[in-house]
Design a protein with these regions (language model features):
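Sec/Tat signal peptide C-region and signal peptidase I cleavage site
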Residues: 13-19
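Outer-membrane beta-barrel "beta-signal"
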Residues: 21, 28, 152-188, 308-320
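Repeated loop/turn-to-beta-strand initiation elements of outer-membrane beta-barrel proteins
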Residues: 21-23, 52-58, 86-91, 129-139, ...
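Transmembrane beta-strands of outer-membrane beta-barrel pores
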Residues: 28-32, 60-66, 80-82, 95-103, ...
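Residues that define the transmembrane beta-barrel architecture of outer-membrane proteins
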Residues: 36-42, 70-76, 117-123, 151-155, ...
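Residues on the lipid-exposed face of transmembrane beta-strands in outer-membrane beta-barrel proteins
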Residues: 44-48, 76-82, 95-97, 125-129, ...
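Flexible, solvent-exposed loop segments that connect beta-strands
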Residues: 58-70, 101-119, 218-234, 260-274
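Detector for outer-membrane/organellar transmembrane beta-barrel domains
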Residues: 73-80, 88, 161-164, 171-257
Length: 320
């Protein structure tokens, strides 16, 4: 998970920098296979401007659902671009590593699925029209390369917005050194299979703020049941925070998840197995008042035994 550690460093640096923006793009994807399967594509990006002509971005990319593949991933790209005007066009090219998650099949049927992970490259070209405000319109052509199953090409369009600076006093109200936070959470968990089975998930989270940009958490989590199978455990994560508005904080976490997992979906008395897996999360927290917080997180559990899952949790908690 070298990429995720590099993103931690990137976001730590960006928390004290100025020109940053977020974007949401959507469009079409074509898999570079003989069948030429097509599907949708979505990109959520966060960009840090390093220089007049250079930027670096962190991207979540969903490559859609071509036949026998549900693939998404995380990419980091270094961009070279023309000067960015207050209003008008800029053009750029980006390249970097891409860590993918692919729900695929071992025998050519939807009943047998596998969760494959690995490294590839992500490369992009874009054209951006900067509006008079902080908003902009973007068209992007992206290509994933070096992945065993297939490469893919995506054409997407969407909007972006430059993030303004938040005064330090406001940042400290959202998260200050020594703060403690207890959250009660509930939501849905989704098995990364072709059926995408869902169940009700719950969590109890404790957080400790080390700096206004770094937190640590321990989460007791129950991912619920799929038929007779059930998984629950405890995760510990380190979080990086970036103020988005005066009351809202964006966050990214990475850590380990120790769990007890029952894999047999037909026998409720089947033996449970113990596993430890990486877990990566992104989220947003809202400061309701001096003590109460609301939070939404999405976590990806990354296993080595074909049992990846997405866990979405929404809740509220008390800061003290």
């Amino acid at each position: 998970m070298r990429y995720l550690y590099s993103i931690f460093t990137f976001l730590t640096i960006s928390s004290i920098a100025h020109a940053q923006d977020a974007s949401l793009l959507a469009g079409a994807m074509r898999a570079d296979t003989d069948a030429g399967n097509t599907s949708f594509a979505v990109n959520v990006g966060y960009t840090q401007h390093l220089h007049k002509y250079f930027s670096v971005s962190a991207d979540y990319l969903n490559e859609g659902h071509p036949k026998f593949h549900h693939r998404d991933g995380l990419g980091a790209q270094l961009w070279a671009h023309t000067a960015i005007p207050e209003r008008g066009w800029s053009f750029g090219a980006g390249f970097g590593p891409y860590y993918y998650f692919d729900t695929t099949t071992g025998n050519g049927s939807f009943g047998d699925y596998r969760n494959e992970h690995g490294w590839g490259q992500l490369m992009s070209l874009n054209a951006i029209y900067h509006l008079h405000s902080r908003a902009y319109v973007e068209a992007r052509l992206s290509h994933t390369h070096g992945i065993t199953s297939h490469d893919s090409t995506m054409l997407m369009v969407g909007m972006g917005y430059e993030l303004g600076s938040v005064p330090r006093a406001i940042r400290l109200e959202n998260a200050d050194r020594g703060d403690n936070l207890v959250m009660l959470l509930a939501g849905r968990s989704i098995v990364n299979s072709f059926k995408s089975e869902t169940s009700t998930s719950t969590g109890l989270e404790y957080r400790r703020t080390f700096t206004p940009n770094i937190e640590g958490s321990v989460i007791l989590m129950n991912e619920g049941k799929v038929d007779a199978a059930e998984r629950k455990g405890v995760s510990a994560q380190v979080w990086l925070l970036r103020p988005f508005t005066e009351r809202t904080v964006l966050e990214m976490g990475f850590g380990a998840y120790a769990m007890r997992d029952q894999l047999d979906r037909t026998d409720p008395h089947a033996e449970r197995e113990s596993h430890v897996a990486p877990i990566a999360s992104i989220g947003m927290r809202y400061r309701i008042d001096d003590h109460w917080r609301a939070q939404l997180t999405w976590s990806r559990v990354i296993t080595n035994y074909e049992r990846d899952s997405d866990v979405f949790l929404l809740g509220a908690g008390y800061a003290f």
